[in-house]
């Protein structure tokens, strides 16, 4: 089942998130397993599967990155998050310095000014990647979208590593 069809949305990358949520809750009310407790086991099984499909579809379309990968899949491109970065060596070489900045932050006990600066750099890159992905989807340049998704994954990963390392640092000083 196509998730765009399931939630009665046009099949395009940019979606109306409010409409997605409204349609999700309508479907949940219609197919919630608790509403079918007195039905046959086979009917309960069908309803449970439909409810799982609704939840999975909602999570997929609500999340920017998951929606991008799903939309690519619908258009004939198989994308695996695990291998995307390996195919973009030039990008990795260019932005590996962000990991060096992270190491410097750790060595300097997470200097607040440096921390804020690095967070801003990463956040700006994430926003830029998302805007580029939206633009490239509009132009149906799917191979470019895949490349930019790999970059977005890199920035999201370093953002998570920064957050994790900073939390470790905070737990050690408290």
UniProtKB/Swiss-Prot annotation:
Listed PROSITE patterns: DNAJ_2
Molecular function via GO: ATPase activator activity; protein-folding chaperone binding
Transmembrane segments: none
Domain J intervals: 2-74
Gene that encodes it: hscB
InterPro entries associated with the record: DnaJ_domain, HscB, HscB_C_sf, HscB_oligo_C, J_dom_sf
Family membership: Belongs to the HscB family.
Function: Co-chaperone involved in the maturation of iron-sulfur cluster-containing proteins. Seems to help targeting proteins to be folded toward HscA.
Keyword ATP-binding recorded: no
Name this polypeptide is given: Co-chaperone protein HscB
Keyword Chaperone: yes
Keywords, sorted A to Z: Chaperone
NCBIfam families: hscB
Subunit-structure text: Interacts with HscA and stimulates its ATPase activity. Interacts with IscU.
One GO process term, biological-process aspect: protein complex oligomerization
């Amino acid at each position: 089942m196509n998730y765009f069809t399931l939630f009665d949305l046009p099949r395009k990358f940019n979606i109306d998130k409010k409409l997605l949520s409204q349609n999700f809750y309508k479907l949940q009310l219609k197919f919630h397993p608790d509403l079918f407790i007195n039905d046959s086991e086979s009917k309960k099984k069908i309803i449970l599967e439909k409810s799982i499909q609704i939840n999975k579809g909602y999570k997929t379309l609500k999340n920017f990155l998951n929606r991008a990968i799903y939309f690519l899949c619908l258009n004939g491109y198989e994308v695996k998050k695990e291998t995307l970065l390996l195919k973009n060596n030039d990008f990795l070489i260019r932005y590996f310095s962000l990991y060096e900045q992270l190491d410097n932050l750790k060595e300097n006990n997470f200097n607040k000014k440096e921390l804020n600066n690095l967070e801003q750099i990463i956040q700006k890159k994430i926003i830029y990647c998302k805007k580029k992905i939206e633009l490239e989807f509009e132009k149906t340049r799917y191979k470019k979208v895949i490349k930019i998704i790999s970059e977005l994954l890199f920035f999201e990963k370093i953002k998570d590593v920064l957050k994790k390392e900073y939390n470790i640092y905070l737990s050690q000083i408290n």
